[in-house]
């Protein structure tokens, strides 16, 4: 999958390309992550990419022209890589909140061009003419779009085929089917007076599967009850709930 990131701080994305699951995917050429600095497309000796906002106010606004040139360059790279469906995504507090359903849709694209804002944001005309989607990672403000972009890339990359060493691990992650994850345990059997649940050591896989589902359902009900209404249960899961509720 092709990713082009428009950012003033390309070095930050070594966290994606050099480490962990996403780093392994990059080394295996499952993903291609290219960072494009809009300063390379700015005019003048200072390579300025920001200006004061019209109408006054604090801070600076990223200028449309260098960003547009950077996006067009990214589109050329995507085309050279054989990618057709490559929308431009702007990471913004005004965007829709990212969730697992959106991530799964991104997985089906050929690639993404991700625009990272800074300062007070970007010129609205750039958004109107070049941005296809705006996404947020939550209702809070960060210094720029780089961290949200890394969240977006990591969440997509781990869902791509052949990336996870254990495909079942990705399937069982929180939110994949609408439920939170179940409690996880490893050695030792006892820690500060707390024991691993006996059922997890029983070797009875059907009972373990049932226990894990019930734990996930109960945890979601307690911590994120609004998610329960969106969950589609299998016939077996409905039976487990019915048996548990008596």
From Swiss-Prot:
Pfam families: tRNA_m1G_MT. Its EC number is 2.1.1.228. One of its GO terms (cellular component) is cytosol. Coiled coil: none annotated. It is found in: Cytoplasm. The keyword Phosphoprotein does not apply. Keywords: Cytoplasm, Methyltransferase, S-adenosyl-L-methionine, Transferase, tRNA processing. It comes from the Bacteria. The keyword Coiled coil does not apply. One of its GO terms (molecular function) is tRNA (guanine(37)-N1)-methyltransferase activity. S-adenosyl-L-methionine binds at residues 117, 137-142. NCBIfam families: PRK00026.1, trmD. This is tRNA (guanine-N(1)-)-methyltransferase.
């Amino acid at each position: 999958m092709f990713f082009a990131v428009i950012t003033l701080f390309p070095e930050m994305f070594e966290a994606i390309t050099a480490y962990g699951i996403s780093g392994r995917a990059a080394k295996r050429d499952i993903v291609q992550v290219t960072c494009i600095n809009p300063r390379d497309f700015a005019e003048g000796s200072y390579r300025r990419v920001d200006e004061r906002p019209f109408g006054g106010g604090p801070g600076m606004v990223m200028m449309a022209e260098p960003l547009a040139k950077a996006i067009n360059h990214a589109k050329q790279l995507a085309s050279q890589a054989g990618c057709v469906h490559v929308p431009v995504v702007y990471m913004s507090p005004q965007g829709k909140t990212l969730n697992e359903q959106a991530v799964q849709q991104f997985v089906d694209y050929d690639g993404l061009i991700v625009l990272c804002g800074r300062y007070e944001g970007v010129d609205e005309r750039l958004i109107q003419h070049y941005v296809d989607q705006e996404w947020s990672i939550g209702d809070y403000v960060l210094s720029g779009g780089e961290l949200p972009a890394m969240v977006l890339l990591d969440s997509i990359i781990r869902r791509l085929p052949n990336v996870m060493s254990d495909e079942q691990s990705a399937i069982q992650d929180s939110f994949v089917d609408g439920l939170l994850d179940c409690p996880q345990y490893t050695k030792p059997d006892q820690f500060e007076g707390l024991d691993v649940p006996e059922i997890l050591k029983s070797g009875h896989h059907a009972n373990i599967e049932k226990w894990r589902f019930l734990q996930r359902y109960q945890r979601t009900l307690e911590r994120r009850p609004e998610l329960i209404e969106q969950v589609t249960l299998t016939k077996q899961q409905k039976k487990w709930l019915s048996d548990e509720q008596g």
